[in-house]
């Protein structure tokens, strides 16, 4: 069975791309913050990868699309961390890679749960609300 077509796919894709843009900005541009709790930065690494991953896994629901996205997000997590030493403000940390992977796993899990239909339901609500 094919997943339903989203009426505002272009809008959701644009918002997802903005999420990836924000992730890259955090990885390479922004100056790191001083965290007060131990391993707090690992939480933010996981969150920064979970949100765009879950978004795109909700946006593309076919099996091959999700698997391709999974590979893309895994590569982004790995190479993003490996390239961080090229930035003057960031350093390489293998535990950050694990936090990134945990975030992608969380995004995958959320997209395969009941939460994974939120985007579809919201799209249907907006499409029916503004239909002429």
Q: Which residues does each PLM region occupy?
A:
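Bulky hydrophobic segments
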Residues: 1-132
């Amino acid at each position: 069975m094919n997943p339903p077509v989203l009426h505002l796919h272009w809008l959701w894709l644009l918002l997802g791309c903005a999420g990836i843009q924000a992730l890259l900005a955090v990885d390479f541009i922004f100056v790191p913050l001083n965290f007060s709790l131990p391993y707090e930065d690992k939480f933010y690494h996981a969150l920064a990868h979970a949100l765009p991953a879950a978004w795109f896994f909700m946006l593309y629901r076919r099996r091959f699309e999700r698997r391709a996205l999974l590979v893309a997000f895994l590569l982004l997590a790995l190479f993003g961390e490996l390239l961080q030493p090229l930035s003057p403000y960031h350093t390489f940390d293998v535990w950050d890679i694990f936090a990134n992977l945990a975030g992608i796993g969380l995004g995958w899990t959320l997209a395969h749960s009941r939460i994974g239909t939120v985007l579809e339901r919201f799209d249907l609500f907006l499409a029916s609300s503004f239909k002429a």
